Curated annotation (Swiss-Prot):
The gene is nudE. This is Nuclear distribution protein nudE. Residues 17-197 form a coiled coil. The keyword Transferase does not apply. Residues 215-586 are annotated as: Localization to microtubule plus ends. Residues 221-233, 298-308, 370-379, 420-435, 489-502, 526-543 have a biased composition (Polar residues).
Length: 586
């Protein structure tokens, strides 16, 4: 289609003709019609295409709407799921939170309990430390108390030993007094018999009259005879009362009085008489065939139980009788010698020889197991209990070693001598070689039982220094160390074991007894001894205390056995010895 500016240009340019204008308009009109037809055809195509596009877009819109609806549904579904999960998570979180809070509370309570437990544990530990320290203090105090008990027990035992030694010394002095009384009576009897044989002498002193011995000045005041020169001898009743009532009942006589009697016998010079084992007490007299002029001294016998402890005693130095030998020398030699004197001397020699062989056989017998084991165990426990106690025991043993034990075993002494046996009181101790006192069945059986101890064997050391020697109470004998320092009395005989007295001869006897004892000694020597041998004898402990252990808790002393060594008990039933083992009965 032509634009609007063209007619103006043509008007101005071609105003010449109208035809031209018309042709022009026609041509323009045709062009416009063709353009309109083209425009309509193109618009119809465009409209069809637009409709297709609209349909496609609508279809697409419907699809998108459906998709949106689906997505909205899914969104709603996810929203519900989210809300559900959120609620579940919140509930779980709340539960967990509650559990956390409960666990925190429990943890706090446990921490508080732990703190309280630690505080209580500290208190318990403090109490345990205090208890341990107090226990240690108590253990130390207990050990000190045990040591003090050991020392006090040792002092008590020492006091008992001293008291026992004083009692033994008192008994020995009593026995010596009785022996002096008996000796006085025997000498007076001899003088009266001599005066009967001879013509009665006047009461005045003459040069031929012997001097009065000093022994009559030493006789006790109870005796009715004070001088052997009486013209009229005392009656039998007065002599019996003087010898029987002057001696009170006392513990058994110790064996140490035999040494005093030996010295008196050797110094006085009158013949010795020793009663035979087979003789009875009533048939013993100074002269064998002559009737007895006075009754024998008798008193109740009591002996103490022995528990294996040694009882040393201080030796007493009693002045001897120096004028006895002078009296013997100044006596007239006109006393006739009868056959009964020789017979008595022969019996005395026979008894001396028999006792020597019996004591030599006793020294070889085996030790008793019960006493040895008890003494050794208690002595060993005492050594381990306290070194201070052992030192004190050594110091006391050293202090009393010079005095020694004058009543220990005297088998190795060899200085026993016979004496005149007019006392019917038996001795319940170990008979020494020279002891002439009558022995009963009990005394001989007890001497056999106690002489089997290995400490009876001869030794070079004094008896008090041997730690394993336990001399029982009532078995007292002499000690060579103290016996040599003690002066002899007029009844002792230092040479009674070796040589005959006044020319008397020994009478042979049966040799079977010595053979039996030698056979028993050979058999018993093979038995092992149960006594321990301590290296240091000074550490011997006479006390029987329980050993205190090193821990301090197990050292409680056990109950001690009943000690009856210091009590005077009633005499036991006398056991009968076996006649086949001894060769003869007592």
């Amino acid at each position: 289609m032509p634009s609007a500016d063209e007619p103006s240009s043509t008007r101005t340019n071609g105003t010449s003709s109208r035809s031209d204008q018309l042709a022009y308009y026609k041509k323009q009109y045709e062009q416009l019609e063709s353009e309109l037809a083209d425009f309509q055809a193109s618009s119809r195509e465009l409209e069809a295409e637009l409709e297709k596009e609209i349909e496609a877009s609508e279809k697409r819109e419907r699809q998108l709407k459906e998709k949106v609806d689906n997505l909205r549904y899914e969104v709603e579904e996810w929203k519900s799921k989210y809300k559900q999960s959120k609620s579940e998570a919140s509930t779980a979180q709340n539960a967990l939170q509650k559990e956390i809070t409960s666990l925190r509370d429990a943890n706090l309570t446990l921490q508080l309990k732990l703190r309280d437990t630690e505080v209580a544990n500290d208190d318990y530990e403090r109490q345990a430390r205090h208890t341990t320290s107090s226990l240690e203090d108590m253990e130390s105090k207990y050990n000190q108390a045990l040591e003090r008990e050991v020392l006090l027990d040792m002092e008590y035992k020492q006091g008992e030993q001293e008291r026992e030694s004083l009692r033994i010394e008192n008994q020995r002095l009593r026995d010596e007094l009785n022996d002096l009384k008996i000796e006085t009576e025997i000498v007076q009897e001899r003088l009266r018999n001599n005066n009967r044989r001879r013509r009665p002498a006047p009461l005045g002193r003459s040069p031929s009259t012997p001097h009065t011995p000093e022994i009559f000045d030493r006789s006790p005041g109870e005796s009715t005879v004070s001088s052997p020169l009486f013209s009229t001898p005392p009656t039998k009743l007065s002599l019996t009362l003087a010898s029987a009532t002057a001696t009170p009942p006392s513990p058994p006589m110790s064996e140490t009085s035999s040494s005093m009697r030996k010295s008196l016998t050797a110094a006085s010079g009158f013949p010795l008489q020793k009663a035979s084992a087979s003789e009875s007490f009533g048939t013993r007299s100074l002269y064998g065939n002559r009737p007895q002029r006075f009754q024998a001294h008798s008193r109740a016998t009591s002996y103490a139980f022995s528990n294996g402890r040694s009882t040393p005693s201080a030796t007493t130095t009693r002045p001897s009788l120096p004028k006895a030998n002078n009296t013997t020398a100044n006596r007239p030699s006109g006393i006739p010698k009868s056959g009964s004197l020789h017979q008595i001397r022969g019996l005395i020699g026979k008894m001396q020889k028999l006792e020597e062989r019996v004591q030599s056989a006793k020294s070889k017998l085996p030790p008793p197991s019960e006493t040895a084991s008890r003494a050794s165990s208690r002595a060993g426990s005492m050594l381990d209990a306290s070194p201070g106690a052992a030192t004190i025991a050594m110091r006391r043993d050293t202090r009393k070693r010079l005095s020694g034990s004058s009543f220990s075993s005297s088998v190795r002494d060899g200085d026993g001598a016979p004496s005149y046996v007019t006392s019917s009181r038996p001795s319940y101790g170990t008979r020494t070689q020279g002891d002439s006192r009558p022995s009963s069945r009990t005394s001989f059986s007890s001497s056999l039982s106690h002489s089997t101890h290995p400490s009876v064997t001869p030794s070079n050391r004094p008896e008090s220094r041997q730690s394993r020697t336990k001399t029982p109470l009532g078995h007292y004998s002499t000690n060579p160390t103290t016996e040599s320092r003690r002066p002899r009395s007029s009844l002792s005989n230092p040479a009674g074991q070796s040589t005959p007295i006044n020319g008397m001869t020994y009478i042979d006897e049966d040799e079977d007894l010595a053979e039996q004892f030698n056979m028993r000694a050979t058999i018993s020597s093979t038995r092992p001894t149960r006594l321990p041998s301590f290296s240091n004898p000074a550490f011997s402990t006479p006390t029987g205390l329980k050993k205190r252990s090193t821990s301090g808790m197990s050292g409680i002393p056990a109950p001690r056995t009943l000690r009856r060594g210091n009590t005077m008990g009633p005499p036991k039933t006398k056991p009968k010895p076996v006649a086949g083992d001894l060769g003869e009965t007592f």
